[in-house]
A protein has these predicted regions:
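Short helix-coil-helix linker/hinge
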Residues: 12-17
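Pre-recognition alpha-helix immediately N-terminal to the DNA-recognition helix
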Residues: 19-21
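C-terminal regulatory/oligomerization modules of transcriptional regulators
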Residues: 1-5, 24-38, 43, 52-55, ...
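Short, Lys/Arg-rich nucleic-acid/phosphate-binding segment
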Residues: 63-69
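Conserved N-terminal beta-strand and adjoining loop/helix that marks the start
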Residues: 7-11
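Residues within the DNA-recognition helix of helix-turn-helix
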Residues: 49
Length: 115
């Protein structure tokens, strides 16, 4: 996943309504009417949110007759989680090193000051 795609995913996930839509879709695919009924926003607003989620690759749309059914595509979220996980491990390692240095500094200070 390139930087631009990652930006789209994080931007899409930044909105509480879009996160709510993904939670609703975790129960299974739904049509736009069903999704709209679950939120206190207009159908055009839901359509804009769905468009943003679609650009980020977080949902897939299937048109059947006159209805459009939406389902979750977890792949981009998993890739974003892997990115976050990488940097979580990176910073944890560096914070552990700082903690070790501070502990050694405290010990050295105590040794210098005596009992």
């Amino acid at each position: 996943m390139d930087s631009h795609d990652l930006d789209l995913v994080f931007s899409a996930l930044a909105d509480p309504i879009r996160r709510g839509i993904l939670v609703k879709l975790s129960d299974g695919e739904q049509n736009v009417r069903q999704i709209t009924a679950a939120f206190d926003v207009s159908q055009p607003a839901i359509s804009r949110h769905l468009r943003t989620l679609g650009k980020a690759g977080l949902i897939r749309k299937d048109k059947r007759g006159r209805e459009q059914f939406i389902r979750v595509n977890a792949d981009p979220a998993e890739e974003a989680a892997a990115w976050v996980g990488h940097y979580t491990r990176f910073w944890k390692h560096h914070f552990d090193q700082v903690e070790d240095i501070l502990a050694q500094t405290r010990k050295d200070t105590e040794d210098d000051n005596g009992p």
